[in-house]
């Protein structure tokens, strides 16, 4: 556990928080609704990539310098700000005040366009950026260099082992009560889709029927050329029986970010743990009580399970950002997919 303090005056800026993996949806933009908090209360994550100004266009950066930073396909621009921004839930901040002249946003909240908009209440130093505008996950991003991490005496949670993953973490339902697809699912599948394409070698893959086909199938049909399926994708991970297949969809540990490794030479495609858990261990509604039966003349009036009002669509921006950071994107067939998707933002094939 740790707290973050002002680097200038040592005032405490957060409650006691524990480090977890950065969610793949951290920089996702979704619809025009207010989104909930990105981070669970009592947790923080670190973004290893540079963030914020100055920005340099791709034409100025060049492929060689970009590859040295782990970006293997063109992006509009790259940040040359400081890496290591820390993100916490808004409710975990302490001793900060808004900077009124920096409280700009696109719609009905703050989006950080004017730079850090939270100051230390003790010394006035700009220390963080509050994000709560529509389309963004609500979060507070602590500015690298303006804050300092201090170990805390709070209880340290034991690192979750793989075998206890299903017991200590819950799966996220794919569909919201309103019938919209869960934004975290769209981001998670978008990131996993990039990895799945990179290990497919450009050949069609077979998916099991059900939620995997519903979430990955349309995108793979649109992006891979027609032809016979050469490889099969299955769910694999802790709590599931061993599967002898070519490609395994495996969980990414929610605390460490470690990817579960299947035995042998099976290619692993990482998927966010909350999405993987729902795919691997779906919670089905029981048709009758666990014990006994329904009394005579009594009918169930439970609401029907939510049904989506549109087809599933992996998040395009998360997909492209993930694909640009995979060395395999330099292969001509995969680079062609990336270029087609990037150059036609309003003509998404799936």
Where in this protein do the model-derived segments appear?
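Intrinsically disordered, low-complexity regulatory segments enriched
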Residues: 60-63, 167, 186, 190, ...
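Extended aliphatic helical segments
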Residues: 3-5, 12, 17-20, 24, ...
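Residues in intrinsically disordered, low-complexity segments of regulatory proteins
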Residues: 54-57, 161, 180, 184, ...
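An N-terminus-focused feature that recognizes amino-terminal "leader" regions
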Residues: 1-106, 110, 317-350
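Domain-exit/linker segments immediately C-terminal to small folded modules
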Residues: 74, 81-82, 102-265, 269-271
């Amino acid at each position: 556990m740790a707290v973050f303090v002002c680097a200038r005056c040592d005032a405490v800026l957060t409650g006691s928080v524990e480090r977890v993996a950065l969610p793949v949806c951290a920089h996702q933009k979704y619809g025009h609704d207010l989104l909930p908090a990105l981070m669970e209360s009592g947790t923080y994550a670190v973004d290893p990539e540079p963030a914020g100004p100055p920005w340099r266009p791709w034409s100025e950066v060049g492929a060689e310098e970009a590859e040295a930073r782990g970006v293997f396909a063109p992006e509009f621009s790259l940040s040359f700000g400081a890496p290591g921004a820390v993100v916490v839930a808004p409710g975990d901040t302490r001793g900060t005040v808004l900077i009124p002249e920096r409280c700009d946003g696109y719609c009905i909240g703050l989006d950080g366009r004017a730079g850090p908009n939270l100051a230390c209440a003790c010394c006035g130093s700009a220390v963080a950026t509050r994000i709560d505008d529509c389309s963004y996950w609500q979060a507070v991003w602590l500015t690298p260099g303006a804050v300092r991490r201090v170990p805390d005496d709070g209880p340290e949670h034991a690192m979750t082992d793989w075998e206890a993953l299903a017991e200590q973490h819950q799966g996220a339902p794919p569909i919201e009560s309103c019938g919209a697809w869960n934004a975290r699912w769209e981001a998670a599948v978008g990131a996993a889709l990039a990895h799945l394409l990179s290990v497919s070698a450009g050949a069609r893959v077979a998916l099991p029927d059900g939620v995997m086909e519903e979430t990955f199938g349309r995108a793979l049909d649109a992006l891979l050329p027609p032809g016979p399926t050469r490889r099969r994708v299955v769910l694999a991970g802790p709590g599931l029986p061993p599967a002898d297949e070519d490609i395994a969809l495996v969980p990414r540990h929610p605390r460490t970010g470690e990817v579960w490794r299947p035995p042998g030479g099976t290619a692993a495609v990482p998927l966010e743990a909350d999405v993987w858990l729902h795919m691997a261990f779906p919670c089905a509604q029981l048709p009758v009580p666990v014990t006994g039966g329904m009394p005579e003349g009594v009918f169930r009036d439970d609401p029907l399970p939510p049904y989506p009002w549109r087809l599933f669509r992996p998040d395009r921006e998360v997909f492209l950002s993930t694909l640009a950071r995979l060395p395999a994107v330099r292969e001509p067939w995969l680079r062609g997919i990336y270029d087609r998707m990037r150059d036609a933002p309003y003509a998404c094939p799936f």
